[in-house]
């Protein structure tokens, strides 16, 4: 239980000189003061956990190529820069490095592609038809489920059970809940006649993808019986390099994610514990 029984705790910055805060955190403090109404330079901030970053992403090879020929991924959408935790400024590194590698790889791929405009039009028309069929099916649904309620339920279960601290029994319960939500999703109703400018239809499409991805995250966590980076299991508090020094790969099958593993290359840099405690050694600081 947090402040006033809510999911909040205090973050006290009042001991830091206001000049220092303004220089280093000025924009953040202004936003906080605008929305909350308190000046964090003089009053402790009220904060709560939130998802700031998603570690992982599309699988790519060393040339930023996905498993789909011709589709490259660079920046925060690919997994390759991320480890078990996010390092500060990694977003910038992933964008710069990914773009540096992906651009020439894309040019090289394009040089060797047999150009056929007619074939491209056929593929486009085929995909357009498929997406329209999905939209039409959603629009015609007339069930009694509210997609926004499903979204809230999914968010609460994921926040409660699939953030940093994870227990296997709760992960199993969460996956069962996600399966329930996916079944209830079939009974949602768009309830919006203005389809030209509707936000309900795009949200419904996004929700379907979020439920799929939530299962990937939940089952991926369930499969990893160790603690590593931002993945902590009290039942398995130590890192297990013998069994889990590998990347989790999930493949879409239409009937739930299919998992495999890819070994992590540590020939140049060995994994080390990131230690924030007082009196840490110089090695731990690296």
Language-model segments: which ranges?
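C-terminal catalytic lobe of FAD-dependent flavoproteins
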Residues: 1-55, 68, 75
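Glycine- and aromatic-enriched mobile tails/lids
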Residues: 2, 8, 53, 59-73, ...
